[in-house]
């Protein structure tokens, strides 16, 4: 992997690079920044937002957000595609992960510090973050569901967590006892995940606070930042420098700023995003960690995929608060790199197992695809922020691609097992193992690095908050499923939107729009990028102007029970990849609506050679049939497409002359495909997304 950065080409001096220009300008000045970040007395941190009104992220006061988030609690997902997943998440996944956390010693790590457990420390350096991500999932779940037992269980856990906090504010169960001298040292910052853990602590604390106003974990997290971090670390002459090591704290600090209104947290996020020249980093670290240098000097996505996605989230959050144009320029270039060179058709990212990293442009292997669940989630989170900054549907299309495919595949249908990686081809007879899944089972109930399971849980718990946004002009409708939104326009006028649909299996969507008082405003309807033909009607009258991959603006005076009817084109598309994607040459992928499909061995009529799917060929130019099977995999649409099975006679040598004929037999067959998200729910079996084709 080539490194485009020379470590000193972008560092002229510490004084020149320690303070981001957007911070050190008219808004505050260098002296004010150093005062804030040196731990000098500041106004007390207090409630800034109305905790009941915050969305997945709180953009209510973000000056450069074109769209404002709608609270998670303001949207109810009703019976339909996502309700099944969310019920499983609430009733099985979140409680099951609680039991896993206990049985694998994650809570014992806290309890041992207060004498409540004699168990030794267990797990890797980032084990604390597992508790915090699970707490964040609970926080989002409690925003839409009254679960007294879950609330009390979580509150008891949080009390035990907070009881371990030291007088300085420090709270981490790994860097204690004989490891205490390692706190925030150079090697610890780059690889020790201290700031990563506090970032997840902040996010979990904020989600719990927004669930019911409970500040227990939030106040503890603030004490960590105010009491331990700010007085000792930052750009000041008597402070030590900071490098995130694993980006995460940046977006958490911006969200803390949004929650409290205290700008010192925003400034600290900007300082970390900018990097500190006093901290020496090797070129390989700069690539892998995706931090430590000015974010605006980045030109491409590289290194650890989750780190880079989280860095982009933090940078976009910073832009939404500051409007720094250099950040937007960089983010736009990185997004182009993502969508043109690095994005799997399933919405997954991160091609390489080594380093869990991005590969070179167009390096998108299938069987060896890593596609970590956390990376797809981070990519979705980043696009959510880019959407808020721009109001452009191209970002929503990417969100939908990831959500329905590369994220949804990460959790089993029963909610009890998870994918760490999400390959696009699988052969159980081959070596499909990796360091997190040594037995190659693909889905497991637990990983010692268990970042993905609670990450998936928090994503599905927060899903209602992704359906809508508001602006000064009206309301944006991003995602489609049976749901009800009860919120208000920017002028305070109440608004209810009821969705009825069988999306994503069918393309018809009906909205009932009911403002509390008749009012003129714009309704922005997303026309998906995969839908070539679209119909939109309001109260039976056709509306023109619907363009694929854009928001259709319907501006009118709306009254109670106005009806919007949309019909999207659910034609099955056979997709080809750019020829530069070497593994996909001569192959096609099937997509219908937002769903990407795959072949899995149990569904094929021909069982000969059942260990793999290498002989199956799809016929281009023939029709695909779509059928809903209510009894298969909790109810899915299946595709049937004409094809053949090629059976080639064995050849004695590994290589042979091209002129030498090899006997091959072609057997007509019908290929059957299922949604990619549903694979590996019947045990490990051969699977492939990209299928060889023959033009007929």
Model-derived features with residue positions:
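Extended ligand-binding groove/face enriched in aromatic
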Residues: 114, 120-122, 126, 141-282
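Active-site neighborhood of glycoside hydrolase catalytic domains
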Residues: 256-280, 300, 307-344, 376-378, ...
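Secretory targeting signals
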Residues: 1-5
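N-terminal export signals
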Residues: 9-35
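Solvent-exposed loop and edge beta-strand segments that line ligand/cofactor-binding
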Residues: 113-131, 182-197, 230-246, 282-285, ...
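Low-complexity, Ser/Thr/Pro/Gly-enriched N-terminal "stalk/linker" regions
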Residues: 36-130, 155-176
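C-terminal beta-rich recognition modules with glycine/proline-rich loops and embedded aromatic residues
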Residues: 43-52, 269, 331, 397-405, ...
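Well-ordered alpha-helical scaffold segments within catalytic/enzyme domains
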Residues: 82-84, 135-148, 199-214, 249-261, ...
């Amino acid at each position: 992997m080539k490194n485009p950065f020379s470590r000193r080409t972008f560092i002229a001096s510490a004084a020149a690079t320690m303070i981001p220009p957007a911070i050190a300008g008219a808004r505050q000045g260098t002296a004010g920044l150093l005062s804030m970040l040196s731990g000098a007395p500041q106004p007390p941190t207090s409630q800034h937002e109305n905790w009941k009104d915050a969305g997945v992220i709180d953009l209510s006061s973000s000056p450069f957000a074109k769209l404002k988030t709608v609270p998670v609690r303001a949207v109810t997902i009703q019976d339909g595609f996502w309700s099944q997943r969310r019920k499983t998440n609430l009733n099985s996944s979140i409680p099951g992960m609680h039991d896993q956390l206990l049985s694998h010693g994650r809570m014992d790590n806290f309890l041992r510090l207060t004498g409540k457990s004699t168990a030794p420390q267990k797990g890797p350096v980032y084990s604390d973050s597992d508790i915090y991500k699970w707490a964040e999932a609970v926080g989002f779940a409690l925003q839409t569901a009254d679960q007294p037992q879950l609330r009390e269980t979580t509150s008891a856990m949080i009390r035990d967590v907070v009881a371990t906090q030291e007088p300085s504010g420090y709270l981490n169960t790994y860097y204690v006892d004989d490891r205490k001298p390692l706190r925030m040292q150079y090697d610890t910052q780059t690889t020790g995940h201290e700031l990563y853990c506090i970032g997840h602590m902040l996010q979990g604390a904020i989600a719990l606070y927004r669930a019911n106003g409970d500040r227990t974990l939030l106040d503890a997290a603030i004490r960590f930042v105010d009491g331990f971090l700010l007085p000792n670390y930052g750009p000041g002459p008597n402070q030590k420098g900071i490098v995130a090591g694993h980006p995460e704290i940046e977006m958490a600090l911006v969200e803390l700023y949004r929650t409290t209104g205290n700008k010192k947290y925003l400034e600290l996020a900007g300082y970390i995003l900018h990097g500190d020249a006093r901290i020496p980093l090797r070129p390989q670290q700069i690539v892998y960690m995706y931090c430590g240098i000015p974010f605006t000097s980045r030109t491409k996505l590289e290194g650890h995929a989750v780190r880079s996605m989280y860095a982009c989230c933090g940078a976009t959050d910073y832009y939404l608060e500051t409007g720094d144009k250099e950040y937007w320029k960089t983010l736009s270039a990185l997004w182009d790199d993502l969508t043109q060179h690095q994005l799997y058709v399933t919405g997954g990212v991160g091609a390489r197992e080594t380093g869990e990293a991005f590969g070179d442009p167009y390096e998108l292997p299938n069987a060896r695809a890593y596609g970590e669940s956390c990376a797809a989630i981070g990519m979705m989170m980043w696009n959510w922020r880019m959407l808020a900054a721009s109001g452009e549907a191209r970002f929503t299309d990417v969100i939908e691609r990831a959500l329905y495919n590369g994220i949804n595949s990460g959790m089993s249908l029963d909610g009890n097992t998870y994918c760490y990686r999400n390959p696009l081809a699988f052969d159980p007879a081959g070596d499909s193992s990796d360091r997190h899944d040594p037995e190659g089972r693909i889905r497991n109930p637990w990983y010692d690095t268990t970042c993905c399971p609670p990450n998936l849980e928090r994503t599905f718990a927060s899903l209602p908050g992704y359906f809508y946004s508001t602006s000064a002009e009206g309301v944006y409708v991003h995602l489609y499923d049976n749901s009800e939104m009860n919120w208000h326009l920017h002028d305070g006028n109440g608004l209810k939107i009821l969705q009825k649909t069988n999306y994503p299996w069918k393309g018809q969507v009906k909205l009932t729009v009911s403002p509390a008082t008749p009012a003129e405003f714009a309704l922005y309807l997303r026309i998906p990028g995969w839908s070539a033909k679209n119909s939109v009607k309001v109260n039976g009258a056709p509306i023109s102007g619907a363009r694929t991959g854009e928001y259709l603006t319907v501006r009118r005076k709306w009254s109670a029970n106005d009806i919007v009817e949309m019909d999207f084109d659910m034609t099955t598309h056979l997709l080809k990849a750019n020829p530069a994607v070497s593994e996909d040459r001569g192959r096609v992928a099937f997509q219908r609506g937002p769903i990407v499909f795959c072949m899995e061995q149990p569904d094929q009529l021909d069982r000969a050679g059942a260990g793999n799917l290498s002989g199956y060929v799809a016929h281009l130019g023939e029709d695909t049939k779509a059928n809903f099977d209510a009894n298969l995999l909790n109810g899915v649409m299946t595709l049937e497409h004409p094809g053949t099975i090629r059976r080639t006679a064995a050849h004695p040598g590994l290589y042979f002359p091209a002129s030498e004929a090899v006997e091959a037999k072609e057997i007509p067959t019908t290929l059957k495909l299922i949604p990619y998200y549903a694979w590996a729910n019947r045990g490990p079996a051969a699977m492939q997304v990209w299928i060889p084709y023959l033009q007929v």
